[in-house]
């Protein structure tokens, strides 16, 4: 086992568990100062959306690197965000471990051609202007209508997935 994602709920519990395990831990909760202070988790797993865009994500990854805390991306939720994290993963040395991909879970996507496809466990960084993807305007309109009808994804208010899974 390379790492265990969120084996317990809090950083404090992870630090206590650290006393009994050599397995690396990762967490979705974004609290870099606490991670440094407690020595756990070993890596923080987030996405571009949670940091407010590419620039702030790069700043966060650089801070993780400065404090020797690992960084991994979790699924980008859309092809746009996934394209961003593919580019950042290719460009930043500190993003050295495999990142999570949930492309097969996407019911629809807002980029031309639909969700990215894995080929032998690899997704190639999109090429072309900007992030290298084209918007599917019809799919984007459908997603916008769904947002207006249903509101944000349940985890959007928390910055992670924990509560949304517990409520289902």
List each model region and its residues:
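Alpha/beta enzyme core
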Residues: 1-3
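Conserved, non-catalytic sequence blocks in retroelement Pol enzymes and Pol-derived host proteins
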Residues: 6
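Shared catalytic-loop signature of beta/alpha-barrel
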Residues: 9-24, 29-134
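Extended hydrophobic packing segments that form well-structured cores
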Residues: 131-168
